[in-house]
Amino acid sequence: MRIKLISQLFAAVGIAGISVAPFLMAPPSPPPLPIEIPVEPFEPKAEVKKTWQCPDCKPEEQYVLAELQKHTRITDRNALATIMGNIQQESKFISNICEGGARVSYDRCYSGGYGLIQWTSVNRYNNLGKFCKNYGCDPSSLEGQTRYMINESVFQRYLPMFEGSGQTIAQYMTPAYYWLGWGIKGNRELYAYDYVKKLKHMV
């Protein structure tokens, strides 16, 4: 009996020994402060588009080259070089040139071809003037003639043949002939090969 009482006493003392009064307990640690993570808005990367450029060309050539790519789906270097070579043969990219070499305004060229591609037939020549009258451009200027050249129905008719790819300069000369209807071929094909060497695919 005495042993049992002693055991109960020790058990009570043990429980009391491990009990701690509430006022002696350390206060709980506060929760950690939230960490602010900066959120950056998602901005999709702009597509970087490469185009054919001609760093060594004259400003007039560079302008026409850029406009052709901006307003058509021509991406093939040979196709662009063919068009450029033909313009070089026709006018050397001089917009106010009348056939024979005279530099005159649109209404002062009385015979032969006129302008970038030497518009010769009465209808095509007159349509240049009508186009610029309707759209507020100068038919003697590089800008006005380039706009008309790209939008002219004859060019639009053969444009799909230039918008393909993988053809040679000689092959692209076929739609170029249908487009321009030249009488003398001259050096247009040689000029085209020269442009192929000068065109660079750049951002």
Question: Which residues does each PLM region occupy?
Answer:
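Peptidoglycan-targeting cell-wall enzymes and recognition modules
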Residues: 40-63, 91-166
